[in-house]
From Swiss-Prot:
Protein species of origin: Streptococcus agalactiae serotype Ia (strain ATCC 27591 / A909 / CDC SS700)
Enzyme Commission number(s) from the entry: 3.1.26.4
Name of the protein in its database record: Ribonuclease HII
Family label: Belongs to the RNase HII family.
UniProt cofactor note: Manganese or magnesium. Binds 1 divalent metal ion per monomer in the absence of substrate. May bind a second metal ion after substrate binding.
Function description: Endonuclease that specifically degrades the RNA of RNA-DNA hybrids.
Amino acid sequence: MATIKEIKAILETIVDLKDKRWQEYQTDSRAGVQKAILQRKKNIQSDLDEEARLEQMLVYEKKLYIEHINLIAGIDEVGRGPLAGPVVAAAVILPPNCKIKHLNDSKKIPKKKHQEIYQNILDQALAVGIGIQDSQCIDDINIYEATKHAMIDAVSHLSVVPEHLLIDAMVLDLPIPQTKIIKGDANSLSIAAASIVAKVTRDKIMSDYDSKYPGYAFSKNAGYGTKEHLEGLQKYGITPIHRKSFEPIKSML
């Protein structure tokens, strides 16, 4: 009789819930075997669910693949709402039908997983571009226009010219066909990839600013108006990276 360890190793090779080998081990009365079967089936179902989710997030891309459009750039931004720091946009071109496990809207992914998924995107992407507009630009032209500028810069920094743009809730003044998608980071893998790249990039910038301007907890709050950040403003005042057109900074001038 095979040991539980040996059976576990065999179960790991099964990837189909309809595989006939399940029946062979289902009759094994050992608790360890039954536990291993349940766990393996759970893992397979989880993988199937993830595959289905990723497939659903390729709907917009697949419509373009049918038209032989393969160089599709997903574009997203991070940092519209914070009181401090830049707005950062990313443009990402993934290979056709590329599925990166657990890729989703950055807001739906635990922060501890951001770096791993970010690295997977960099490893698999055909091209990645970043655009950054600082707080001065945001104050000069407003956050909406600064976001557009950051997105256009991100596209211009791609090493490959895209054939089509999938953009999260924006239309850009660029001579490239584009599709505006509401909640794009939750509905397109290309845009989700851009959201992760933008998020990790901006978090690193804000972490560096935390060292330069201690007392505001920028590495924790990324410039958003948390209690700790607002207390820092009251205690230490405004830094050069604060957005002077945003309240409560505007009223502190």
